[in-house]
Structure formats: structure tokens, C-alpha cells
Amino acid sequence: MKKDSRKTQRRHKQGCAVIDSSLKLDSRVAVIRLDLSYQDGKGSADRLNSDLNKLRLNARSKSSIFKDQIGYVIKLEKGNNDNYHVHALFLFRGHEVKNHKYKAEQIGRYWQEIITKGDGLYHNCNTKEYDKNCLGAIERNDEDATNALKKNVAGYLCKDKQSIKNSNGSDKKIREFRCSVIKK
């Protein structure tokens, strides 16, 4: 197996730090995982970057959805057929967010209906098919769940594959990997 690149190692360390920081802020964390994308032909690297910036900026003012968020890790990717998409991990105060599947649906619908004005798609990973990835409520003292979250989810989000390049060839930087600021 190929050794992870320094970039992947750095990203993984940052992602794990966000998880650790969130668990220090609240003894129970609601872990939400979404894949965000576009309908065929509706997305580009630049649009994805712009829409993701809107999502992050709007999160500050959209308290009905993001009020109890304490962290996030986001990876932008380009898949087959120029399919631009995002893998996102959102961390919320678990004592406030009781229904993680519903919270994932709220964020997904917000992406689809408001941010992308109907052009967006989302996949709610907080379903039974992803149970092994420790999504949903995680207790601070549950080391097995925390380690599985770091290995399976943060590890997946931090991978090097499917790198994004600007669609118009500009030098404008598109940040492929984004994390919340570690709160102390």
C-alpha cells in the first residue's frame, strides 16, 4: 500500500484536530456527513467554490440550521465526467441536535434549494448504510467510535485523489480542503 503524501497527512491531522476540539467543547457530538454536488452539466470548480463559500457564510446567519455547529471538515473533488462534488463533515453539539438524520436533511435541502437554486444534489450519509463510520451521536469518552470516525471518515475526506483544477485555467486558488478554526 502506498504511503500517504505529506498533504494527506497534514489534512488528516487537521481533520482529527477539529474532531478532538469538538469533543472538548461538548461531551456528545452529533456527526453529520453529506455529499454535495450538482445535476449533470450544472457544476464547475468555480461554481462549487462560490457556492461552498455562500454555504459557509450563510451558516453564520442561518441559525435554524447551523446554530449548534461546532466544527466542520470539507473536501472539494472532481470525479468522473467532470463531476464536481463535496464531501462534508459537520459537527454539532450533541445535546442540542438529537436527530442527526434530520439535521443532515436540513443542510442538504438548504444546499439544494437555497444555495444552488435547484441545481444542487445531496446525499445524506447519516443512513444505515454508513453505520460503521460512526455518524450520529458520539460520546467524548467513546474511543472506539472516535477512532473509527477519524480513520474512516476523516481519512476518506483527506485523501489526495480526485484533485480539483480550476475549470477556466485561471490562477485563482480553489481551496480543496477546508476546516473550521479549532476552538479553545
Regions found by a protein language model. Give the residues of each.
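Histidine-centered divalent-metal-coordination microenvironment in nucleic-acid enzymes
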Residues: 72-94
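A short, flexible beta-alpha/helix-coil linker loop
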Residues: 39-41, 91-96
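Catalytic "initiation/cleavage/transfer" segments centered on a nucleophilic residue
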Residues: 1-26, 94, 98-184
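General N-terminal targeting signals
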Residues: 51, 89-91, 103-105
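Amphipathic, alpha-helical segments enriched in basic
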Residues: 9, 63-67, 86
